[in-house]
A protein has these predicted regions:
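N-terminal nicking endonuclease/strand-transfer module with a His-rich metal-binding environment
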Residues: 1-153
Length: 153
């Protein structure tokens, strides 16, 4: 059974989300893992895509959108939403879920649930209590970049 977690962030540094997704972090302290020279280590396996943005310029593009709409300019505004879906290890072991398949699921979920938003979708493996878990992250700008048709629900 997958677990969904949501975090609303007032942090104006959109690049922090990018760094967390791409680089290795200690799962308990959340601090980046550094090599002998003090450089952050890239995750061994990750898949990264952007919706309505380039994944490697997500931060700059979100700032441009916010400036264009004159939104997210004050400290108290929620700047982004971060969704984390963690899969049960059985999904990998018994059903053959791969990182690529999890990324595809993440992209589908983001397209269906966050139309018009700039979004980062990233899948990676992490080890929690000595168990490897596959998870995907969706980070969206709280401001919708593109208009979408109203939905009937």
């Amino acid at each position: 059974m997958a677990i969904l977690k949501h975090i609303a962030s007032k942090n104006a540094d959109y690049g922090e989300a990018e760094r967390y997704l791409i680089f290795q972090h200690d799962e308990y302290t959340q601090k980046p893992i550094l090599d002998d020279e003090g450089h952050m280590l890239i995750r061994e396996e990750y898949y990264l895509d952007g919706l309505n943005c380039d994944p490697f310029s997500f931060a700059a593009e979100c700032m441009e959108t916010n400036a264009y709409f004159h939104k997210n300019q004050s400290f108290n505004e929620i700047k982004s939403h971060h969704y984390i879906i963690s899969f049960d290890p059985k999904d990998r072991d018994e059903h053959g879920l791969t990182g690529e398949q999890a990324q595809k699921l993440g992209l589908e979920y983001a397209r269906e649930n966050f139309p018009g938003h700039q979004a980062l979708v990233c899948t990676h493996m992490t080890v929690i209590m000595e168990v490897a878990i596959s998870m995907f992250h969706i980070v969206i700008n709280s401001i919708r970049k593109y208009d979408v048709e109203p939905q009937p629900y």
